[in-house]
Amino acid sequence: MDMDLNNRLTEDETLEQAYDIFLELAADNLDPADVLLFNLQFEERGGAELFDPSEDWQEHVDFDLNPDFFAEVVIGLADSEDGEINDIFARILLCREKDHKLCHILWRE
């Protein structure tokens, strides 16, 4: 895969894209009670956080997860408005290079 450092999504664009994908697919992949909980609580406690891909993605994909081009977005709820997300609904792996649309999602079980 040829990738260009100058053709990447910004961190904000990456978060926005991951959240849009989450909203589009959540109803088909989460328990209805979880979807309801997330929708009711997101305004107060919800969030999306951007990370370098964790090593456990290697169990799910068979390519190099260079953090210059791949990001992991964690979407869920925190105990408080400024707290860390500890109730995870989805972990989304995205390629940030604009010409390589790639997404993998690990949903809450």
Swiss-Prot record:
It comes from the Bacteria. May act as a double-stranded DNA (dsDNA) mimic. Probably regulates the activity of a dsDNA-binding protein. Belongs to the putative dsDNA mimic protein family. This is Putative double-stranded DNA mimic protein YciU. It comes from Escherichia fergusonii (strain ATCC 35469 / DSM 13698 / CCUG 18766 / IAM 14443 / JCM 21226 / LMG 7866 / NBRC 102419 / NCTC 12128 / CDC 0568-73). The gene is yciU.
